Amino acid sequence: ASDVYKRQELFPNAISKRMDWDTTRGKFSFDKIINSFAKQEIDILIGTQMITKGLDFKNIGLVGVINTDHFLNFPDFRAHEKAFQTLTQVAGRSGRSGDRGKVLMQTYQPEHPIIKNVIENDYEKMYQNQLLERKDYNYPPFVRLIRITIKDKSYEKLNNSGDWLNRVIRDNYKGIVLGPVYPEISRIKNKYHKQFLIKLRNLDELNRFRSIFQKIQKSFDSISKYRSVRIIVDVDPI
């Protein structure tokens, strides 16, 4: 509400619209907002990342990205690659009939390599830096990944079952095992989540771990107090 008030105070004559999940739930809501903006019936369009998804607007003089650091600090090994893609897409939306528009990015990390790559539109440098980083920290394409997620309504039961799995996995597999940790969103539909991440050097190692974990899961399923805990195994998670 304060943002709306501030916007009206700064641009009293401007017509503005929001584009997010709430405002595009209706059958034709998305298209209606897009068409209105294309016809210049809307002066300021404020929204989430969906604004960048394949939309090509003309006559945009200024694009602003709020909290760019959210993209850079997201807990995912692909975060920097995705940040570059999104910010480059956003920058590409700005311009009037062949003239260059302006892009403003709010950040506490103006010297961050990804911010510099975006400003310089240097995909090759971003690509090479990301390859080196992933090789150093054992991430794809240099390893395969298995993500194991456990879910339960009981916080205590989830932690206890996670401790059991952690001990048994590490006793039976001597490769790289990370976790268990709570993901950024740790409770969905009234269930708590915890995750393991297994890093595997090749397909043989992946198959060996899957065979080991199938036996572990059988033992886990036989423990009555953990019967409600759900296990999801995701190979090469996206």
Where are these regions (language model features)?
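Accessory helical-bundle/CTD segments and flexible terminal tails appended to RecA-like ATPase motors
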Residues: 10-17, 26-74, 89-238
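Short, conserved loop/turn and helix-capping segments at secondary-structure boundaries
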Residues: 77-84
